[in-house]
Amino acid sequence: MAKVFILCGKICSGKSTYSQELRKSHKAVILSVDDITLTLLGQNGGDTLDVYVEKLEQYFFQKSVEIVETGINVVLDWGFWTKAERDFAKEFYGSRGIEYEFHYISINDEEWYRRLDKRNKDVLEKKSDAYYVDEGLAEKFKSIFEIPAKDEVDVWVE
């Protein structure tokens, strides 16, 4: 049976790049919240972005079951920033007998800030359609993110 690869990591940690590697090596479909929200809302999600993100995540959980049932692997490319989110995913797939793997993309703060600066520069220069992350938003994400315990994940990517 196909499986679900669940990516955990901070914004701008390399999840989307890693998801492409998994897509190629495991013949998987990527379900990315950012791809949809950026396509529909651009940089202007504002206060409604959180609502769209929550609804997309719910939709992607259901859609991933359909995809796996057809025999195709799935990569969930969003952060799973909290233990509660990770626990929900484990329960969701485990209760349905669907195989899953958690992959954590580890990044130190120095490298993270360097990548954020590069991303923001690329966004401003129209070289990237990723989200622009200002200092306030970066600190908000940093305060929310809970680094998983080693026993929470199947693959720890340095």
Region roles according to the model:
Residues 122-158:
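Small-molecule kinase domains that catalyze NTP-dependent phosphoryl transfer to phosphate-bearing small molecules
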Residues 13, 17-72:
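Conserved substrate/cofactor phosphate-moiety recognition/catalytic segment
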Residues 7:
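Hydrophobic anchor at the beta1->P-loop junction of P-loop NTPases
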Residues 4:
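Walker A (P-loop) ATP-phosphate-binding motif of ABC ATPase nucleotide-binding domains
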Residues 10:
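P-loop (Walker A) phosphate-binding loop of NTP-binding proteins
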Residues 52-96, 100:
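Glycine-rich phosphate-binding loop used to anchor ATP phosphates in small-molecule kinases
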Residues 28-30, 100-104, 152-157:
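Conserved beta-strand scaffold positions in the cores of enzyme catalytic domains, especially
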Residues 96-116:
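Conserved phosphate-donor/acceptor-positioning beta-strand/loop module used by diverse small-molecule
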